[in-house]
């Protein structure tokens, strides 16, 4: 239940496991390393000091990312203070990824992600709106009540360009080749295929159970 770099390059469509379920339980023994998640050979940057960082890697045009968003958002709201959650838009090649990466960080700079992040998904997947060029994105901003001059200034800003580059670097550190995927504290990585190993039916929501177990694992290690 993911969109891979290979699948994107052939068809721009995800091919995944069937069915989106409620958050399914893992086996009683919990997720297994090398089966439901992998440990990074070289740790990635771990985020804010004193926090357990969790990253979702996504792409706005990925239908599985769109379907995953409600469960992910609800999960994020339940996290305690020691968990720092953030999203990272991926880049597999220049177009159409660059423009949508910069869109995300422009909305972040304008403090509009809480209101417009889900609307970007809705525009692409429900309204079939093309959001692949600066002109497309400016029109989207205007339609949603954003001053187009402020949007363009943010979109072209050094801050947004720098964050887009950093996003590519962190995705490379986690060796991301499919979305949606999740990284935990610079140490662990899982995606829909891994999280659903051995399951009769697949759901990206199962990633959240794996991530919960990995957060507990990091937390226990920090206390040791």
Report residues per predicted region.
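Extracytoplasmic thiol/disulfide redox context detector
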Residues: 2-95, 213, 219-224
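Periplasmic c-type cytochrome electron-transfer domains
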Residues: 30-40, 129, 134, 201-211
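Structural microenvironment flanking redox-active thiols in thiol-disulfide oxidoreductases
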Residues: 78-109, 113-142
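Extracytoplasmic/secreted proteins, especially bacterial periplasmic and envelope-associated proteins
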Residues: 53-56, 67, 71-74, 98-102, ...
